[in-house]
Swiss-Prot record:
PANTHER family: TRANSALDOLASE. Belongs to the transaldolase family. Type 1 subfamily. GO terms for cellular component: cytoplasm. InterPro entries: Aldolase_TIM, TAL/FSA, Transaldolase_1, Transaldolase_AS. This is Transaldolase. It is found in: Cytoplasm. It comes from Rhodospirillum rubrum (strain ATCC 11170 / ATH 1.1.1 / DSM 467 / LMG 4362 / NCIMB 8255 / S1).
Amino acid sequence: MSETKLDALRRHTIIVADSGDIDAIRSFAPQDCTTNPSLILKAAKMPAYAGLIAQAIEAGSAEAGPSEGLIDRILDHLAVTFGSELARIVPGVVSTEVDARLSFDTQATVARAERLIGLYAARGVAAERILIKVAATWEGIRAVEILQSRGIACNVTLVFSLAQAVAAAEAGAFLISPFVGRILDWHVKASGKSFDIDEDPGVRSVTEIYTYFKHFGYKTIVMGASFRSSAEVEALCGCDRLTVSPALLDQLRSQTGDVPKRLDPAASKAATISRLAVDEASFRWQINEDALATEKLAEGIRLFNADTDALRRTIAETLAKRASTVA
């Protein structure tokens, strides 16, 4: 029997499942799993996971704290409830995201991350099994620097530029997630044209970041994310890790054939590359001059916050129904 493309990819790259759907993840046996508010919201709407929602509400309601913070406490428990279930399935790490509203507050991000790790510990999930996802703002990256120094590994997300990637690596981030598909989306909208896979701006961006990291010897893992097609996934074969949706994993599993390695550390070492300055002033200037990074970073934070707000409404409605039933 011929090798599937998914198996061929696995010879060169660690495959990660990008989903909160526990049953879907179980079927692909990935090494790791990533979640975000959008994926948790999608999973929370599935009847199969109503029990996990109830667990989170019970845990959050039982926790001491002011009434105005109840829904946020429940949200933390919801993320950890899903993450703990995922940690039972994958042998590696599970990424859990910090509230998007904290993207510009270093100390609040650190505090929330430490709280999430504590909630995981209470469920018997060790800190080394968890990556805390933090948006690639300057403040977020500073939080990552603090968290990494305290032994909490981080996944820097919403990476759309080399400046963000390098700043995260210099802060000691365990892993970064450059967003392939959203970069492509921006260029398609801006130019009004389509791109062949060899010209795909998202693929090129991840390739540039990977090459830079390997050339200068950064230990930070590059994990391509946000794919629009299986062709994009194949085009980044050899990247440290790739986090892929169940739909695209299914496509790759249903196709046979070789997937050639495209990214190679040895070739990256031989490349001619200049170092990039990423102090605060230069970081902010480079993001300011990069319309794609500016727009997509802001949009990504807004979208994650919108989905978190949708989760808040769902929880509030559930709490109201419970209160009316008791009354």
